[in-house]
Amino acid sequence: MRLLQKTCFLVLASGLALGQTSNSGSAAPGSVADELKALRDAIGEQQKQIAQQQEQIQTLEQRLQEKTSGTPHVADATLRTASPAPATTVVQETEKPKESPLSFRIGGTEFTPGGFVDFENIFRSTNTGGSTATTFGGIPFSNTVQGHLTEFRMTGQYSRYNLKVSGKYGENNLVGYLEGDFNGNDAANVFVTSNPHTNRIRLYWLDLKRGKWEFLAGQSWGLETPNRKGLSPNPADLFLTLSEDANVHVGVPYTRAGLFRAVLHASDNFAWGLEVQNPEQFVGANEVIFPFAFNAQLGPQFDANNQNTTPNAFPDIITKLAWDSGSSGPSIHFEAGAMMTSKKFTVLPVGGTGFSSHSKVGGGVLGGVNLGLSKGFRLVGHGMWGEGIGRYMIGSGPDAVVFPVATGPATFDADLSMVHSGSLILGAEATAGKSQLGFYYGGFYFGRNFFLDTTNPVAGRFGGFGGPNSPNSANRSLQEGSVEWTQTFWKNPQYGAVLMVTQASYLSRAPWFVAAGAPKNAHLGMGYLSIRYVLP
C-alpha cells in the first residue's frame, strides 16, 4: 500500500512540474532539463530503496515461519531495526550455570541430586556391639567378656543420598532438602547373609527466604547443633567434625528432629533464630531408678531408650544468635543461645484416691566459636550447660529423676528433679592441598541426683541417678580424643571425587558408683578407614 502511494505521488509531482514548465514562458530550457533529471534520479533512488525493503520483508517472513513452524499466531509485521538484547537475555536466563552436572530443571525449579557411596571398615578394641555408630555410654568394662574382645566390621550402610530442590518465585527463595542413609533399625540377623540394612530419613525440610526473614519447617539439625556459618540448616554449614562415626563425636550436642524455625537476618553478618522442636523426656537405659512404689506407673512416661510413649508437655524452645565476619580478614563465626524444656508425669499416690500430676521446666545455655586464623587453619570450640537437657548429648545421660514425697506416715506422692549436664568440644582443623586434618577433644558430664527411696520395703535403698549402689551405666563423664584425616585421591567437577576418610579415637567413660574391686573406667580404642566416592 505504501509503495502504491509513493508511486502515485511521484507521477503527480512529475505531471505538475511539467505543467508548470510549459505554462511559464520565462523558464529557461536548461532549467527544465535539470529538474527532469533530478526527478528521474529521485525516482530511481526510491525504487532501489523499495526493492531493498521488499527483500528485508521477505527475509523476516521466512525467519518467522521457521520459528513458528506453522503454529497459528499474531505477529507484528512493522519493519524496524532488530535489537539483539532481548535474545541475549533469554539465553542468559535459560543457560545459567547449574549447581551440579547432575542438576536438571523443570520450569523455574532446579533439582540437584547428591550423596556418596561409602565402603567403611571399623575396628574397636572392645566389643560394643555397634556398627557405624558408637554407643559412647555403653563401652564395656574390662571385668566383662565384651571388655576382652575386639570387633571388626565392613559395611556400606553409611552411604548417603540427598536431593535439593530450589527455585525463586517472585521475592521468595525456596529450598527443599531430603537426605537419607541406611543406618535404620536393622534386624538382629542383618549381618548373616544379605546385609539388608534399613533405609532411613535423616533430613527433610523446606526453607523459605524472603527479604530479611527465613523460615524452616520439617526434620532438621536443631539449633543446639554447632554451626560453622550463620544459622544455616545445610549440613556443610554445621560443625560436626570430620568424624566418620555415625554418632559424630563425644562433646557435640545435636538432634535431628521435627521443628519450625524463624530467623531474622538483621544484616549480612548477624542472624537471630527462634525454634520450636519436638520434645522427649529421657532417662536413658538403666541409668535412672524410679521410686519403688511408682516404678510401674512411671516406666511408660519416660523414654528409657526403648519407647515412644512419653507424654511431653510442650515443644522444646531454642533461640540462638550468630555473628559472622565479612569476606575480608580472618573468618570468624560466633554463636550464643539458650533453650527451655519441660517434663511431666502423673501417678496415683500411695494411700490416695485421686491422680496427682506434676511438671517442671528446665533449660540451658550454649555458645561456640569458629576462628579461621589463616586460609588453611582454624580453631573450633563449643559448649553447653543446663538442667534437663541430657538427651541433647547424644542420649548419653538422663534429663530428670522422680523422687518420693511423704504426705503422711504411710502415704506418698512424687515430684520431679532435673539432672544437670554439660558438653564441651575443642578442636583444630587444617587443610593442605588435597589433605584435611582434624584434631578434637570432647566430653560430656552428668551431675548426680539421687535420694533415699522411702517407698522401698528394703531399708537403705537409693533411687535417682548416680547414687550409692547405682548401676555402672549411670555415667559421670564421657571423653573422646580423635585424630581425623581425609585425603582426596581424585576429583573432577564433572565426575565427582574419590576420598579416603580415616579416624583414630580413644574413649573413656566413668560411672558415678564403682563397686569394690571393679574398674573405675571403661576404655575404648577405635579406628575407621573408608573409601568414598562422592557424586559431583
Where are each of the predicted segments found?
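Outer-membrane beta-barrel "beta-signal"
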Residues: 522-536
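Transmembrane beta-barrel strands of outer-membrane/channel proteins
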Residues: 115-123, 178-182, 217-221, 274-278, ...
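Short sequence motifs at beta-strands and strand-loop junctions characteristic
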Residues: 150-156, 196-198, 250-254, 309-314, ...
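Detector for outer-membrane/organellar transmembrane beta-barrel domains
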Residues: 328-483
